Amino acid sequence: GTSRAAMMFLSNWLNEYGELGIMSVSSEYLSGRSVYINKESRINHALNHGGAAVVRLYLEEEHYVLMTGVKNGNILLFDPYYWDKPYEQKDILMDWNHPRSYNRVVPFKYFNQENEEIYSLGPVEEREAVLIFNEKTKTVPEEVIEYFI
């Protein structure tokens, strides 16, 4: 598995490459209470505005996935673990039609749990995520106007 220090290293490494102009990329390291899923979270904001998120969660053990989008109360993610049968949880779906974007569709409700159940982010104090943005396509809150009725 990947060490926790590696998450911060990944974020710093991506930012260095972006600052040097090697890649058009930036990142942000999140931990603890900043790592959760809902409409107002920084993770969801990144996913809704062209970013992605590497998060540590649980799938039989600590595990890392790449979140790539949000759709209808679900997180679209790429899970590198090969899984060839349906999950016991019928609302967690495998998707083989988007191999360059995601291969799992997981409802929000699984992530914010503080236990070590499937796709849980686990105890708040142990949570980590790295938000990743393509600087050419990234939008910032000031550039996005949202209307609430």
Regions found by a protein language model. Name each.
Residues G1-Y119, P123:
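Conserved active-site-adjacent core of cysteine acyl-enzyme catalytic domains
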Residues E60, N74, S120-I149:
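Mixed-charge, low-complexity intrinsically disordered regions
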